Amino acid sequence: MAALRLLAWALPRGVSALRPPPALPHRLIRRYVSDRSGSVHFYTDPVKAVEGVKDGSTVMLGGFGLCGIPENLIGALKTKGVKDLKIVSSNVGVDDFGLGILLASKQVRRVVCSYLGENALCEKLYLAGELELEMTPQGTLAERIRAGGTGVPAFYTPTGYGTLVQEGGSPIRYAPDGHLITLSEPREVREFQGRFYLLEHAIRADFALIKGWKADRSGNVIFRGSARNFNVPMCKAADISVVEVEEIVDVGTFAPEDIHVPNIYVDRVIKGPKFEKRIERLTTRDSKPAPGSKDNDPSRTRIIKRAALEFQDGMYANLGIGIPVLASNYISPKMTVYLHSENGILGLGPFPLKNEVDADVINAGKQTVTVVPGGCFFASDDSFAMIRGGHLQLTMLGAMQVSQYGDLANWMVPGKKVKGMGGAMDLVSSKKTRVVVTMEHCTKTKQPKILKKCTMPLTGKRCVDLIITEKAVFEVNHSKGLTLVELWEGSSVDDIKATTACSFAVSPNLKPMQQIKLDA
């Protein structure tokens, strides 16, 4: 009200507030800035910046992998020694950096995340009963956080229907002897326009620890590259948001339209004393695969070259790590395909040269990447709005198992292997997006991966549209089952029957397995 009175006083009589006002006196500008910055506190000591975090607090940690993590504030939590923390994070980084530091010091009671990645310590603590782990689809996690920041208590999403997320029973806590103590609860389900949706509840935290690029002296924040990720929605969803930045600049340095998080969401700012900005998976296009690596496997190359035929000019596509990403190397230069990465990039380019590597520009597989001209960055909640909203024409990903009706399992082996679903459940949840699975036909122990019914926890139910292996290509009808449409020249229909654990039809137009031509 005081600001409105000042504005009314400054406007000449008869001048509408709807019209562009004359410039305000400089003393008023100073008054406005000093009034607002008084509610944003600036710190030089990271430990003091996290004052108020106590045993049992719920803390959101921004970032994706190691990109955009608040490394100085995480270090401050370790120094502070608080314990029994409930951490909300997109994933858990690595053993000795990021969230891994707090796990190693046994300060965390529960982690709410979507993906463990390569953090063997987290997986070990979880399976040993020393850590509670609440796995949530990445897009659902982003939306739960966004809802928490906007005052929306709950929402419905198609993600996770027909999986453990909906049914409940996903292991949250094991006992030291290996038996289950805590399981996830089933979700409420409602039908809208012939589709089933799960009720998900918003998440809020006591504290959000955020990594920005720059902040001005009134607390407005901007981010760099793909480091926007979960930082933006988390900054809005906590009682106290603490932002560490690389630089603090004067008010007015940022154009108003360039500000990513307005100061109304920011409580504390600190310029980080130092930044390691470690890269989890340094990948360059001028590095050659090691001898004996999978990249030199002829069977793998065969799948890649067949998968590349699924791209169409003008398509928006999301590619999983491994074979799907490698298939993009074969996109024709005559064709434009907009590659989406769920951590917040549209317009992925090739891997960088060594002198182009940027820790703030990574893909969903934590690899260093480039962005093509016309590409853009955005936050994780926007990214999954694109996914769930059906704005992608294609998603291509790997699998542990696929059923004859298109059920997909690719995120968990109970009691043995826990990686998490990441964004996969969201990617296969849109009916408008074609789902292509690329995988080897059998496991390393020669067990079929195409089954009558998946035995592992599902990622999605009746969602796969096409299966590509080194032996064959199957089209999937969600009510009728599989049809063999392409066969590698070294295989036979009898061979496919012997290595596929379900029935399938054979197309009357069965043809040799197609391969993209390098000059196509």
From Swiss-Prot:
Its main location: mitochondrion. GO terms for molecular function: succinyl-CoA:3-oxo-acid CoA-transferase activity. InterPro entries: 3-oxoacid_CoA-transf_A, 3-oxoacid_CoA-transf_B, 3-oxoacid_CoA-transferase, CoA_trans_fam_I, CoA_transf_AS, CoA_transf_BS, NagB/RpiA_transferase-like. Residues 1-39 form a transit peptide. Pfam families: CoA_trans. It is found in: Mitochondrion. The active site is at residue 342. It comes from the Eukaryota. Its EC number is 2.8.3.5. It catalyses: a 3-oxo acid + succinyl-CoA = a 3-oxoacyl-CoA + succinate. Keywords: Mitochondrion, Transferase, Transit peptide. Residues 280-299 are annotated as: Disordered. The keyword Transcription does not apply. GO terms for biological process: ketone body catabolic process; ketone body metabolic process; succinyl-CoA metabolic process. Pathway: Ketone metabolism; succinyl-CoA degradation; acetoacetyl-CoA from succinyl-CoA: step 1/1. One of its GO terms (cellular component) is mitochondrion. Homodimer. Belongs to the 3-oxoacid CoA-transferase family. Key enzyme for ketone body catabolism. Transfers the CoA moiety from succinate to acetoacetate. Formation of the enzyme-CoA intermediate proceeds via an unstable anhydride species formed between the carboxylate groups of the enzyme and substrate. Probably play and important roles in the energy metabolism of spermatozoa. This is Succinyl-CoA:3-ketoacid coenzyme A transferase 2A, mitochondrial. The lineage of its organism: Eukaryota, Metazoa, Chordata, Craniata, Vertebrata.
